[in-house]
């Protein structure tokens, strides 16, 4: 299955190829890392009890260059932010991304 997603801080569509979905257990996708190759993202979900779930995200397939290492660290920060936003949404019903970025510039409000 192919979908396209976007992010306020990185305007434009990002094509994503979903390669595997195991309900309540795992999602695997591939998307372009830049420079004409894809990375593989694996999201794993493990129940830790009635109200707790451990979520692990890994992204593999990066080339070894400073540019690609920088991109991988940027994506790591993005995945961390996404998980924090999801946790607050699930537990408190608050959308942390709403108002976080100016949709015209992709930057936090007031940033130069």
Language-model features, listed with the residues they occupy:
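Beta-strand/loop substructures that line and gate deep hydrophobic ligand-binding cavities in soluble
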Residues: 33-81
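Short, solvent-exposed loop/turn segments at secondary-structure junctions
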Residues: 10, 28, 63-65
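Beta-strand residues in well-ordered beta-sheet regions across diverse protein folds
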Residues: 4, 28-30, 56-58
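Short, exposed beta-strand/loop patches in secreted or surface proteins that constitute
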Residues: 18-20, 46
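Short beta-edge strand/loop motif at the mouth of beta-sheet-based domains
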Residues: 1-17, 24-26, 97-108
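Residue-identity detector for threonine
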Residues: 5, 19, 39, 53, ...
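Short, conserved beta-turn/loop elements at beta-strand boundaries and strand-helix junctions
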Residues: 22-27, 50
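A conserved amphipathic terminal alpha-helix motif
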Residues: 61-112
């Amino acid at each position: 299955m192919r979908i396209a997603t976007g992010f306020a801080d990185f305007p434009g569509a990002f094509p994503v190829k979903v390669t595997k979905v195991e309900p309540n257990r795992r999602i695997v996708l591939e998307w372009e890392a830049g420079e004409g190759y894809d990375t593989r993202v694996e999201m794993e979900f493990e129940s830790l009890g009635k109200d707790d779930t451990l979520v692990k995200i890994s992204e593999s397939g990066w080339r070894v260059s400073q540019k690609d290492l920088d991109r991988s660290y940027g994506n790591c920060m993005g995945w961390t932010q996404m998980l924090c936003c999801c946790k607050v949404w699930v537990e408190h019903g608050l959308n942390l991304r709403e108002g976080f970025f100016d949709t015209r510039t992709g930057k936090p409000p007031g940033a130069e």
